[in-house]
Design a protein with these regions (language model features):
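Bacterial Sec-dependent N-terminal signal peptides
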Residues: 1-23
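Cys-dependent protein tyrosine phosphatase-like superfamily
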Residues: 21-165, 179-276
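Ser/Thr-glycine-rich phosphate-binding loops at phosphate-binding pockets of nucleotides
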Residues: 170-176
Length: 276
């Protein structure tokens, strides 16, 4: 019980409101593209031991189906060689990726198989107006994580030193946000910074979220409050992931070792590769 209270305290320290400094820090890492939003570098964050995550090695984004030729050239120049897609088959069919020349795309749809399927229980729950409950359940369900995120860590450990990796989903918020949080935690970034990176999605998707909310209300008859819950990144959502991990595995480090394959040797290698 004491450990759980401590965990909740640590992960609720982050302020859900953006200060100007937080926005500036987030904005400088944005990769501006014509055909994609919420595309940013995960580098630059300080770790607990005084090092920093390397810039230009790990990127996160929303969907990539509208990338222009200029965008693709920019991603090629960034050295992006691996593109991990967390979306399910319905999402991929609706908005197929465009990827830079010579990059390899990897499908990692675990847990997303029925997202976008109007007949699925996920969609039915969403339409009933249980937005908050749906999101909390989604974040706390760690069962799909092994097949979704373990390959990402494996790729990071094997990536060519001159290359970069990009991971994404549809909005670049939930599945992508969890991936970024686990990677940053493994690299030794503190919880407050991890939460700020996660919440930055609300800043980058401000106008897009309003469009999405209007579309949900107009096209699906969803009430605005439920639609807003579906589009926002909230502290309690990401907290639900870490609380679930702690309940099952005792510590996040034990989870990273037993489920993500990051024993002490692999964790040290990961930090050597991606910290300076």
């Amino acid at each position: 019980m004491h450990r759980m209270k401590k965990l909740l305290y640590l992960f609720f320290l982050a302020n859900p409101l953006f200060s100007s400094a937080q926005i500036a820090d987030s904005a400088k890492r944005e990769v501006k593209l014509q055909g994609a939003i919420n595309f940013r570098d995960v580098g630059g964050y300080a770790t607990k031991d005084g090092r920093h995550v390397k810039w230009g090695k790990i990127y996160r984004s929303a969907e990539l189906n509208n990338l222009t030729d200029a965008d693709l050239l920019k991603l090629q120049q960034l050295g992006i060689a691996r593109v991990d897609d967390f979306r399910g088959p319905f999402e991929v069919k609706l908005a197929p990726d465009k990827i830079p020349l010579n990059a390899t795309r990897i499908d990692l749809p675990s847990g997303s198989e029925h997202i976008g399927d109007s007949g699925s229980s996920f969609s039915k729950t969403m339409m009933k107006g249980n937005g908050d409950l749906l999101m909390l359940n989604f974040y706390s369900n760690t069962a799909p994580f092994a097949n979704r995120y373990r390959p990402v860590f494996k790729e990071l450990l094997q990536l060519n030193p001159d290359s970069a990796l990009l991971f994404h989903c549809t909005a670049g918020k939930d599945r992508t946000g969890i991936a970024a949080a686990l990677i940053l935690y493994a690299l030794g970034v503190n919880e407050k910074t991890i939460m700020r990176d996660y919440l930055a999605t609300n800043y980058y998707r401000t106008s897009e979220n309003e469009k999405a909310i209007s579309g949900m209300v107009k096209n699906y008859g969803m009430d605005e409050a439920t639609a807003r819950k579906m589009t926002e990144a909230k502290e309690k959502y990401l907290n639900a992931t870490f609380v679930s991990i702690i309940r099952q595995y005792g510590t996040v480090n034990h989870y990273l070792e037993s489920v993500m394959g990051l024993d002490k040797k692999m964790l040290q290698k990961l930090r050597t590769l991606y910290l300076n």
